[in-house]
């Protein structure tokens, strides 16, 4: 990102029980643009569409495949200073701490992880996210629904694919 561009995130819902993955779209796409309007135009060129249920394209019970719900750019400065929660729920993996370290141990740690009981027992800490690549990797490792899990579209035309490092 330069001083005149921002990062926008578009997420795909698995409408009809599956995700669309091709050479342009996957679960999440990140677009560098001067404003939200430009990001939407780029997303549409890549194959994103809006109001799919209303148009009869998407499953009415699952909902629209794509949405433009978040017009604000990704706040990388906030995630670089305040960090993001990084958690692994206990009982999902054979070794919860090892799984947390596999997913998040390579990030700069702001708050060391510990077991907490919020919405179930989780091993939770805070990590620093320094750039769009780290943000996309964090989201891929947290959700990891498709292969690739994300694509980053840079303003200069460069495209980077991001793959989950999850073990499940």
Task: Please report, for each region that a protein language model flagged, where it lies by residue.
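Generic alpha-helix signal with a bias toward terminal, lower-confidence helices
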Residues: 20-22, 41-43, 164
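A short, exposed loop/beta-hairpin motif centered on an aromatic-Gly-Thr core
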Residues: 22-34, 120-130
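Short aromatic-glycine-(Arg/Gly/Cys) micro-motifs in beta-strand/loop hairpins
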Residues: 1-26, 109-111, 117
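Short, mixed-charge low-complexity intrinsically disordered segments
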Residues: 45-168
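A short, structured loop/turn motif at beta-sheet edges
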Residues: 1-4, 31-42
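Generic "edge-of-domain/loop-turn" microfeature
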Residues: 15-17, 36-38, 134
């Amino acid at each position: 990102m330069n001083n005149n561009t921002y990062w926008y995130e578009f997420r795909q819902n698995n409408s009809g029980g599956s995700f669309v993955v091709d050479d342009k779209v996957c679960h999440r796409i990140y677009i560098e643009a001067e404003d939200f309007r430009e990001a939407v135009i780029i997303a549409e060129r890549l194959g994103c569409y809006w109001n799919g249920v209303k148009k009869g394209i998407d499953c009415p019970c699952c909902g629209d495949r794509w949405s433009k719900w978040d017009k604000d750019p990704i706040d990388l400065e906030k995630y670089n200073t305040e960090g993001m929660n990084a958690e692994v729920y206990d009982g999902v993996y054979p070794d919860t701490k090892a799984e947390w370290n596999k997913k998040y141990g390579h990030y700069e740690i702001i708050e060391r992880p510990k077991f907490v009981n919020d919405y179930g027992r989780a091993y939770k800490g805070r990590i620093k996210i320094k750039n769009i690549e780290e943000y996309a990797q964090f989201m891929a490792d947290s959700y990891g629904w498709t292969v690739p899990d994300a694509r980053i579209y840079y303003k200069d035309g460069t495209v980077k694919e991001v793959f989950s490092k999850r073990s499940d």
